[in-house]
């Protein structure tokens, strides 16, 4: 955890000292719950405070590289929420989905780029790039496919009435096949994978924002690399 903390803080501070200062408060003032304990739900998210209270970060840290990326992602949310509470009114501090996911994915990109610059082993760099490409595919193409499944599910419900698990699985496989286009073999067990995605019940219509955020961050970071210091207010 201490290593993950250092990785995130070094990257955020290197990008902008003010970002590093705010991120440090999340660690120093215990605004993050990271231990995996009995009865704790899985996943990760950031939660708004109010004008008078700070945001919180919820995650389950097990020491993997993906957990570090998740921490960087949620810290992006956390900083966005903190600054919104500081600069905006109570009625304007809550951001739309697309803007929220842009902030979090940008936080991931900051940490990834910082690690890439510090890594001298070409094979490790290649492994990191491969993982990043895989992550980008999941964030853009897969989330769009999931969004199309969700749209198809609601459309079918309106037109056909109550849907069976078999019908939902059929819609799931159809939209997944549109994405993979025969590049992978999808076994029968994969038909049920729609059932583990909590967004369909907990945050309907959400997942397209991940794809939007990823694409906008790629454009924004490219602009940052071209303009450097003038990019940062």
Question: At which residue positions do the language-model features occur?
Answer:
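Cation-handling catalytic/transport regions enriched in His/Asp/Glu
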Residues: 1-233
């Amino acid at each position: 955890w201490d290593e993950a903390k250092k990785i995130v803080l070094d990257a955020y501070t290197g990008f902008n000292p003010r970002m590093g200062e705010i991120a440090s408060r999340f660690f120093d003032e215990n605004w993050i719950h990271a231990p995996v304990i009995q009865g704790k739900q899985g996943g990760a998210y950031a939660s708004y405070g109010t004008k008078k209270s700070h945001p919180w970060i919820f995650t389950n840290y097990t020491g993997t590289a993906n957990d570090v990326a998740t921490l960087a992602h949620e810290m992006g949310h956390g900083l966005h929420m903190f600054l919104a509470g500081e600069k905006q009114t109570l009625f304007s501090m809550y951001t739309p989905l697309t803007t929220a996911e842009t902030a979090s994915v940008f936080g991931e990109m900051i940490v990834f780029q910082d690690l890439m610059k510090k890594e001298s082993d070409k094979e490790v760099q290649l492994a990191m790039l491969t993982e990043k490409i895989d992550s980008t595919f999941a964030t853009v193409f897969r989330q769009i496919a999931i969004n199309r499944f969700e749209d198809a599910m609601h459309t079918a419900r309106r037109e056909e009435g109550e849907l069976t698990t078999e019908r939902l699985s059929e819609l799931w496989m159809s939209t997944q096949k549109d994405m993979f286009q025969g590049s992978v073999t999808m076994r029968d067990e994969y038909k049920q994978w729609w059932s583990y995605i909590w967004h369909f019940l907990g945050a309907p219509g959400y997942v397209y924002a991940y794809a939007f955020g990823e694409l906008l961050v790629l454009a924004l970071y490219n602009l940052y690399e071209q303009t450097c210091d003038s990019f940062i207010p």
